[in-house]
C-alpha cells in the first residue's frame, strides 16, 4: 500500500490519540485544581506503526479490507496509576463518559497471563471529526500501575522485538 494511503488511514487515529491524551490529562489537571487525589499518574498515547499493523494482520490472518474492524489497537492510550486500586477507579471514570463507548474489556488483573502480564484493557469506540465528516473508530486503553508497566514493557520487548536467543528460563516466565 502506498505511503499517502497509509497516511490518510492513520490520520484520524492520530487525532483520536491526541484528543484522548488531552481528555485524560485534563482529569489530572482537574484533580490538582480541586486539590483532590488523582488516580491517574501519567498518560501516554501512540498510533501503531504500519509495520506492526501489517505484522499483526499477517499473524491473525486479517484481510486488508477488515483492518479497521479487526485491528482494535491501531490507536492506543496507556493510563498509568500509582496503585492497583486506582485502576478500577479509572475504568469507572471511562465507563461513565458520554464521549466514548466501551466495546470490550479484558481484565488481566484477575486473569493474569502466563507470562505474568497484568493490566486492564478497554476497547472503545470513539468518534473524531475530520474534514470528510465524523469517523467512528476503535482505540485501546490500557490501565495499569507503574510496576505493571515496567514488567509489561520488558515482556513486550522480549516477545515482539527481541531478535536474539532468549535463555530458556526467561522464555518460560
At which residue positions do the language-model features occur?
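Short amphipathic alpha-helical segments
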Residues: 73-77
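Charge-rich, low-complexity segments
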Residues: 1-72
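Long beta-strand-rich cores associated with HINT superfamily self-processing modules
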Residues: 68, 81-173
Amino acid at each position: 500500500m502506498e505511503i499517502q494511503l497509509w497516511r490518510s488511514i492513520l490520520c484520524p487515529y492520530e487525532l483520536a490519540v491526541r484528543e484522548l491524551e488531552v481528555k485524560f490529562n485534563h482529569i489530572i489537571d482537574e484533580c490538582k485544581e480541586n486539590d483532590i487525589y488523582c488516580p491517574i499518574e501519567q498518560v501516554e498515547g501512540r498510533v501503531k506503526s504500519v509495520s506492526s499493523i501489517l505484522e499483526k494482520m499477517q499473524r491473525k490472518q486479517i484481510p486488508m479490507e477488515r483492518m479497521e474492524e479487526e485491528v482494535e489497537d491501531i490507536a492506543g492510550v496507556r493510563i498509568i496509576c500509582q496503585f492497583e486500586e486506582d485502576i478500577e477507579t479509572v475504568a469507572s471514570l471511562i465507563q461513565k463518559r458520554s464521549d466514548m463507548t466501551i466495546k470490550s474489556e479484558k481484565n488481566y488483573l484477575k486473569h493474569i497471563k502466563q507470562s505474568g502480564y497484568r493490566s486492564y484493557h478497554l476497547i472503545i469506540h470513539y468518534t473524531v471529526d475530520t474534514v470528510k465528516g465524523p469517523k467512528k473508530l476503535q482505540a485501546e486503553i490500557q490501565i495499569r500501575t507503574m510496576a505493571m508497566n515496567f514488567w509489561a514493557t520488558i515482556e513486550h520487548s522480549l516477545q515482539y522485538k527481541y531478535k536474539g536467543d532468549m535463555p530458556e528460563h526467561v522464555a518460560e516466565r
